[in-house]
């Protein structure tokens, strides 16, 4: 399985509202064990964990938009790269949409990483 495929599987798991196991996280994110816990904690609603993961795996990227959608009451997170490119739709490569802001941030992080894979 490629890293891109592993990231796609991890994104699907998180989008489904499920907590991924440590092996799934390890396959998708090549980060130290201590940082893998950020993924689990972000799925449970920790904004601190989502922020820590963002800083660890996407250095220099910023949160361009962090808002709640008034119609669906879900959260939209848009991340911008160092060059200033960003997405404006939750269907795009680096935007997360979810009823939990930390999980939405995690989805945006994972989609940004997925988009970077060739």
Residue spans of the language-model regions?
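Generic hydrophobic secondary-structure signal
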Residues: 1, 5, 48, 109-110
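Extracellular receptor-binding modules and their adjoining Ser/Thr/Gly/Asp/Asn-rich linkers
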Residues: 3-4, 10, 17
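Short acidic (Asp/Glu) and glycine-rich catalytic loops that position anionic groups and cofactors
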Residues: 5-7, 33-34
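General helical structural elements
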Residues: 7, 39-40, 55, 107, ...
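Short, hydrophobic/amphipathic alpha-helical patches that form generic packing surfaces
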Residues: 12-13, 23-31, 103-114
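N-terminal segment of the canonical double-stranded RNA-binding domain
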Residues: 14-91, 98
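Glycine-rich and polybasic anion-binding loops at the starts of cofactor/ligand-binding domains
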Residues: 81-118
């Amino acid at each position: 399985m490629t890293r891109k495929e592993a990231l796609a599987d991890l994104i699907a798991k998180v989008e489904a509202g499920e907590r991924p196991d440590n092996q799934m996280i390890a396959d998708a994110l090549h980060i130290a064990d201590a940082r893998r816990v950020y993924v689990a904690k972000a799925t449970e609603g920790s904004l601190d964990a989502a922020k820590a993961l963002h800083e660890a795996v996407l250095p220099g990227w910023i949160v361009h938009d962090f808002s709640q959608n008034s119609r669906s009451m879900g959260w939209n997170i848009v991340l911008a790269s160092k060059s200033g490119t960003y997405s404006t739709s939750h269907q795009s490569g680096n935007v997360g949409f979810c009823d939990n802001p930390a999980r939405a941030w995690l989805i945006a992080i994972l989609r940004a990483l997925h988009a970077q894979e060739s």
